[in-house]
């Protein structure tokens, strides 16, 4: 891992350097880090750069060090994807990170039950409610799991908690769990503008769709294959990995689509950029999505997106301007076909998607989260100095931070 860049000097000496503890089921180095990992990585990199200290407690995975330190960042890895929750609670209760100023609890369908045991000021980050995810992955068993692990804890324990989420749709879903909307803040995900940008010369010569993300059942990638099957002469780049890959490989053979799909598996950041630039349309058909990070990343490369109209995707895509939304697979296939067949429409959507992506930056996202964390800290400690990084910054908003600088090894 490379050394971290030195912290930026605050424009005011009257500011505090915080120690932020993150509780998450996985960190950004995990092979299944996904959008959660990207979000945490981007924000943590900036908090460190602004002079703060960050500790993360997350699950372990094969080959991961139990403790990893770089500069003011410490990653603690305990338990597996299921056992990380009791392990993290027990280890933190015993004082693993005794001096945190504020806690960011990341809830990906399972809570850490922090209202029962955590006395440090805290904020709960929920990307999206996972009920549909549970049902899609586990059927009837998933309904019971969602009730026990997500629905009941949120309704019974978290009513007085402060929440952060990434779209209005997710905010509404959280509020439906009995949380006062006034306690829910929204901060859209950003884009690394220095890492993504258009290159018309890199566009594929033949009509090309791109799906980029984890290969999970709830992502409903079979619907992407439906769209492909209804549009002859189109190629699909399928980038990412996950436990649904074998089923998708079998589906390709069963449908006779193998020759029209390039299965890439995990891809590097460099390859991700190439795929975004090659694609004519970026497509996602997930059953649960808080925002749609691939939508804004593709947009930064002037590639329009297509999706089913649900969750945060209906906010990430401005239908008819930066991409297309549909209410069912048949309509999605028809709209995608129209975009692929009309170069003027496709170029107009791509230009608008690029302009829209420029409205989002990780600096803004990281600062908004830090504001909320600091507000909870100062509410518990009246008179405390504000956190460094909340005053006007001296560097360009949206500047990219090298992923290796915070130990990132995560492909898509």
Where in the sequence are the language-model features?
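Membrane-proximal helix-turn-helix segments that form the acceptor-binding/catalytic region
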Residues: 142-163, 172
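Conserved donor-binding/catalytic core segment of Leloir-type glycosyltransferases
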Residues: 164, 200-231, 237
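Carbohydrate-associated surface elements
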Residues: 169, 190
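Nucleotide-activated donor-binding/catalytic signature segment of Leloir-type glycosyltransferases, i.e.
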Residues: 249-267
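Short alpha-helical donor nucleotide-sugar binding micro-motif in glycosyltransferases
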Residues: 266-267, 274-279
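Aromatic "clamp/platform" in nucleotide-sugar-dependent glycosyltransferases that forms part
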Residues: 287
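Conserved acidic donor-binding segment of nucleotide-sugar-dependent glycosyltransferases
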Residues: 319-330, 338-344
């Amino acid at each position: 891992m490379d050394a971290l860049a030195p912290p930026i000097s605050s424009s005011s000496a009257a500011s505090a350097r915080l120690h932020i503890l993150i509780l998450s089921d996985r960190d950004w180095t995990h092979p299944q880090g996904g959008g959660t990992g990207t979000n945490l990585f981007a924000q943590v990199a900036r908090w460190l750069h602004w002079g703060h200290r960050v500790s993360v407690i997350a699950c372990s995975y094969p080959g991961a060090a139990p403790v990893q330190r770089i500069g003011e960042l410490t990653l603690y890895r305990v338990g597996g994807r299921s056992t990380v929750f009791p392990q993290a609670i027990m280890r933190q209760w015993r004082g693993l990170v005794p001096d945190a100023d504020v806690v960011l609890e990341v809830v990906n369908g399972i809570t850490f039950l922090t209202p029962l045991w955590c006395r440090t000021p805290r904020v709960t980050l929920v990307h999206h409610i996972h009920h549909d995810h549970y049902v899609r992955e586990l059927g009837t068993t998933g309904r019971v799991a969602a009730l026990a692990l997500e629905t009941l804890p949120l309704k019974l324990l978290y009513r007085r908690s402060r929440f952060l989420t990434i779209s209005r749709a997710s905010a509404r879903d959280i509020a439906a769990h009995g949380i006062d909307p006034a306690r829910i803040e929204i901060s859209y995900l950003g884009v690394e503008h220095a890492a993504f940008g258009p290159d018309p010369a890199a566009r594929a010569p033949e009509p090309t769709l791109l799906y980029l993300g984890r290969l999970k059942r709830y992502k409903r990638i079979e619907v992407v294959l439906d769209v492909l099957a209804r549009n002859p002469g189109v190629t699909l780049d399928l980038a990412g990995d996950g436990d649904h890959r074998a089923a998708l490989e079998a589906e390709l053979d069963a449908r006779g689509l193998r020759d029209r799909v390039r299965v890439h598996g995990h891809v590097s950041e460099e390859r991700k950029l190439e795929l975004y630039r090659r694609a004519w349309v970026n497509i996602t058909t997930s059953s649960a999505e808080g925002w749609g990070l691939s939508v804004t990343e593709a947009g930064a490369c002037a590639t329009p997106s297509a999706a089913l109209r649900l969750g945060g995707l209906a906010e990430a895509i401005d239908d008819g301007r930066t991409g297309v939304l549909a209410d069912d697979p048949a309509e999605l296939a028809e709209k995608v076909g129209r975009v692929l067949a009309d170069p003027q429409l496709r170029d107009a959507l791509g230009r608008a998607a690029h302009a829209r992506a420029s409205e989002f930056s990780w600096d803004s996202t990281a600062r908004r989260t830090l504001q909320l964390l600091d507000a909870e800290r100062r509410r518990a400690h009246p008179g405390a100095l504000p956190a460094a990084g909340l005053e006007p910054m001296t560097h360009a908003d949206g500047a990219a931070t090298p992923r290796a600088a915070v130990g990132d090894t995560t492909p898509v």
